[in-house]
Amino acid sequence: MAEFPSKVNTRTSSPAQGGGAVVSTLSPDLGFVRSSLGALMLLQLVLGLLVWALIADTPYHLYPSYGWVMFVAVFLWLVTIIFFVLYLFQLHMKLYMVPWPLVLMVFNVGATVLYITAFITCSASVELTSLKGSQPYNQRAAASFFSCLVMIAYGVSAFLSFQAWRGVGSNAATSQMAGGYA
């Protein structure tokens, strides 16, 4: 058996100037905003805001169907803001262990399905809940139209994120380094 050495050399050192803290500044990636993914996210944010603002301006709480539309619109709007900020400031690059193309594809497919149900619910409830030609009728009809548009925007995003996840048109090694957006 080896014995414990009788003499051990130790060395102490003082911390570096400034405490060793790393400070990095967040700077927006304007290339992301110009990309198809960034432009679609901005479109989803604007259209989603229109949907829930139009519904919120009516007495939607009296009708459960509009409660569902509000839930879908507000929830997906907030999650889209989170994804937009993550990609705009390249925070997704710091969380490299997360498969972002897959996460984005699953989110966009789920958002498309939820907006399909919200669009059907909203458009089917317009005539049942308000008088034709009244302000609530017009607002709910406009919300139905914009929910259809945002549903299409999420569908296009789902298709593009599926292609990014599969690696169509890019090398798998460079797609992670390029930020993962087209």
Swiss-Prot record:
The keyword ATP-binding does not apply. Residues 1-20 are annotated as: Disordered. Residues 57-68, 121-141 are extracellular. Residues 32-166 form the MARVEL domain. GO terms for molecular function: structural constituent of myelin sheath. It is found in: Cell membrane; Myelin membrane; Apical cell membrane. Residues 1-35, 90-99, 163-182 are cytoplasmic. Residues 7-16 have a biased composition (Polar residues). Keywords: Cell membrane, Membrane, Transmembrane, Transmembrane helix. It comes from the Eukaryota. Its main location: membrane. Phosphorylated. GO terms for biological process: myelination; regulation of endocytosis. The keyword Plastid does not apply. It is a multi-pass membrane protein. InterPro entries: MAL, Marvel, MARVEL-CKLF_proteins. One of its GO terms (cellular component) is myelin sheath. The chain crosses the membrane at residues 36-56, 69-89, 100-120, 142-162. Forms oligomers. Belongs to the MAL family. Main component of the myelin sheath that plays an important role in myelin membrane biogenesis and myelination. Plays an essential function in apical endocytosis. Regulates epithelial development through the regulation of apical endocytosis. Part of the intracellular machinery that mediates basolateral-to-apical transport of ICAM-1, an essential adhesion receptor in epithelial cells, from the subapical compartment in hepatic epithelial cells. This is Plasmolipin. The gene is PLLP.
